[in-house]
Amino acid sequence: MLDKIIRIATRQSPLALWQAHYVQHLLQANHPGLQIELVPMVTRGDIILDTPLAKVGGKGLFVKELELALLDGRADIAVHSMKDVPIAFPEGLGLVTICEREDPRDAFVSSHYTHLDDLPAGSVVGTSSLRRQCQLRERRPDLIIRDLRGNVGTRLAKLDNGDYQAIILAVAGLKRLGLENRIRYAMSAEESLPAVGQGAVGIECRLDDGHTRQLLAPLNHRHTELRVCAERAMNIRLEGGCQVPIGSYAELEGDTLWLRALVGAPDGSQMIRGERRGPAAEAEQMGIELADELLSRGAREILAAVYLDNPAR
């Protein structure tokens, strides 16, 4: 069973390579002697850096090339940041494993200010996420929000060069890259509700590859799977891509799941929030019901306007 080399498709960014090596470590810890090769690739999202993500088109922006490698046999598994995983998969492929979640919160990063509330009016804050932008604008309409693209190192360099007074990044990415010291504080879910699946690593493979699926089975983290299942069910119902102003965050308290969600107008003028508590075993249904509630309260109109403005989604 261990004589076959498992090839991992991954993006080439430092964070993506960290995730691929993390999965490699977990696989080899569970299957000593297993041979693994990394297949680094460049995705469309890595190439187009001069356009806001929402304008480029969010669905599959960072995963399509990896999925093609799975389909044509160049790779056996693809490792993704769950917040980049589209709501639908090509025929024959599927998400089979979700690893234990890292801290899913957003991080406030600044060279001179310790908190979002400390920023003077007119300060420039960098983020390309419509989800982060709408929450920032709701809380601090006096700030200037500008797009910020590139890998983590590039974004930090732009901050250090003085292009921005602060930037918002994922806590998980900074921790994984050994840059936790750059975090001024982790923003609470009340202040900045995370993205669907944020902080979790997912593994995609060919659904008919029983051998590989058997190798991956021990890596699945059930608690994380339940939480992300609820978040993704909500997102699927909303027909949300990766680059839309949707936040969703599920927490497990014993056998009870607490799911919070929001849909916001990018300018922060309208925010629709909701939450559900229920049995963790009903995670998917909770996500669907919460999405339906948000849609009935105006989320449909907000998202329609976003998609009209960003037709490439």
UniProtKB/Swiss-Prot annotation:
Q: Which domain of life is it from?
A: Bacteria
Q: Name one GO biological process term.
A: protoporphyrinogen IX biosynthetic process
Query: What is an example of a GO molecular function annotated in this UniProt entry?
Result: hydroxymethylbilane synthase activity
Keyword set for this entry?
A: Porphyrin biosynthesis, Transferase
Coiled coil region boundaries: none
| Keyword Calcium carried by entry | no
List the SUPFAM superfamilies.
Periplasmic binding protein-like II, Porphobilinogen deaminase (hydroxymethylbilane synthase), C-terminal domain
Q: Which residues carry this modification: S-(dipyrrolylmethanemethyl)cysteine?
A: C242
Which EC class, in a word?
A: transferase
Q: What does this protein do?
A: Tetrapolymerization of the monopyrrole PBG into the hydroxymethylbilane pre-uroporphyrinogen in several discrete steps.
Quote the subunit structure annotation: Monomer.
Quote the protein name from its UniProt record. Porphobilinogen deaminase
Q: Which gene encodes it?
A: hemC
